[in-house]
């Protein structure tokens, strides 16, 4: 019998079903607890090897978790071990709604998908998609700002509103009017996820703390994160990279870059006013790690439920 054949016979048992042991699932659980992806996969492979050498063909999910926990402790990963147990208690017993906000080009999509992969959250929704749905429901005559980009929405304001604002104020007023109808769709998705007990990550420019309903700020399993980029050079490079893999014109972003900067600063200020973490997204790996730490800390008070999860 080959090594691979032996591994395929290891079953992880639960009350309702059995499933084959998976290094990928275990590595993802360890990664969510804060271990580096390369280290988490190495440890998962070692645990797989130990089970094989001990001729373990069936193991309960609880016993596997104990093995993983004590392996972490013995390797001086005590902090990760505690977080690992925390996530095992929380996942699948509480829906997780993570809102990743930030202006155009700061990297909300990339971070959202990385978090989804680490946490095993199957659904990532961009607010641009929600905006498209809202456009089908609201006519252009009623809310013309909705039919513009976040940084050109000011051009759809009435002339009388132009006269009441300075240039920056006009840009931000247009942005707010653009965001408001999209927030209705975002809040509807959050409400449905909470009702159905499903987890989701929503990302995009339209997530602005202080403009959303106050009730979401106090919910322990609705977590706001704001990304920013202080470096203009890095920010512009992100637009250049985006233009290479999509049909979004680089020139349009660069022409409106000063307005995008104003919107970025506005979102940062609103985040600080509402005690939402602001994360400098220069390094993807460091940003993901920081986000995981914030999410883990937020869930540290939700540990009274019995452990049950599709993760190991």
UniProtKB/Swiss-Prot annotation:
Name the cofactor(s): a divalent metal cation
The source's superkingdom equals Archaea
PROSITE patterns reported for this sequence: ATP_CONE (PS51161)
Indicate whether Transmembrane helix appears among the record's keywords: no
Q: What is its EC number?
A: 2.7.2.16
Q: Which GO terms describe its molecular function?
A: ATP binding; kinase activity; phosphotransferase activity, carboxyl group as acceptor
Is Cell inner membrane given among the entry's keywords? no
Start and end residues of each ATP-cone domain: 8-95
InterPro entries the UniProt entry points to: 2PKG, ATP-cone_dom, P-loop_NTPase
Instruction: Give the catalysed reaction(s), semicolon-separated.
Output: (2R)-2-phosphoglycerate + ATP = (2R)-2,3-bisphosphoglycerate + ADP + H(+)
Q: In which pathway does it act?
A: Thermoadapter biosynthesis; cyclic 2,3-diphosphoglycerate biosynthesis; cyclic 2,3-diphosphoglycerate from 2-phospho-D-glycerate: step 1/2
**Annotated NCBIfam families:** PRK04220.1
* Homology family: Belongs to the 2-phosphoglycerate kinase family.
Q: What does this protein do?
A: Catalyzes the phosphorylation of 2-phosphoglycerate to 2,3-diphosphoglycerate. Involved in the biosynthesis of cyclic 2,3-bisphosphoglycerate, a thermoprotectant.
Q: Which PANTHER family match?
A: P-LOOP NTPASE DOMAIN-CONTAINING PROTEIN LPA1 HOMOLOG 1
What name appears for this protein in its UniProt entry?
A: 2-phosphoglycerate kinase
Native species of this protein? Methanococcus maripaludis (strain C7 / ATCC BAA-1331)
């Amino acid at each position: 019998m080959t090594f691979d054949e032996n591994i395929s016979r290891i079953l992880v048992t639960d009350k309702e079903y059995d499933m084959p042991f998976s290094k990928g699932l275990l590595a993802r659980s360890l990664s969510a607890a804060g271990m580096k992806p390369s280290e988490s996969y190495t440890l998962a492979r070692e645990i797989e090897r130990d089970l094989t050498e001990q001729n373990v063909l069936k193991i309960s999910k609880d016993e596997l978790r104990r093995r993983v926990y004590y392996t972490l402790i013995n390797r001086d990963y005590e902090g990760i071990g505690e977080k690992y147990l925390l996530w095992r208690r929380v996942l699948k017993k509480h829906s997780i709604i993570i809102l990743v906000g930030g202006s155009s080009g700061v990297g909300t999509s990339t971070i959202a998908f990385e978090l989804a992969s680490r946490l095993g959250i199957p659904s990532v929704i961009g607010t641009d998609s929600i905006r498209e749905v809202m456009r089908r429901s609201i006519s252009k005559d009623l809310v013309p700002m909705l039919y513009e980009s976040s940084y050109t929405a000011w051009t759809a304001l009435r002339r009388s509103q132009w006269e009441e604002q300075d240039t920056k104020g006009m840009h931000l007023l247009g942005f707010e009017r653009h965001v408001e109808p999209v927030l209705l769709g975002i809040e509807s998705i959050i409400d449905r996820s909470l009702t159905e007990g499903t987890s989701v990550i929503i990302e995009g420019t339209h997530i602005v703390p202080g403009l959303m309903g106050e009730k979401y700020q106090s919910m322990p399993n609705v977590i706001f994160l704001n990304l920013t980029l202080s470096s203009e050079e890095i920010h512009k490079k992100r637009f250049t990279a985006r233009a290479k893999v999509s049909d979004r014109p680089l020139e349009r972003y660069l022409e409106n870059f000063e307005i995008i900067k104003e919107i970025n600063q506005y979102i940062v200020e609103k985040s600080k006013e509402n005690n939402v973490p602001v994360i400098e997204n220069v390094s993807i790996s460091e940003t993901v790690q920081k986000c995981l730490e914030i999410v883990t800390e937020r869930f540290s008070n939700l540990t009274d439920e019995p452990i049950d999860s599709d993760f190991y």
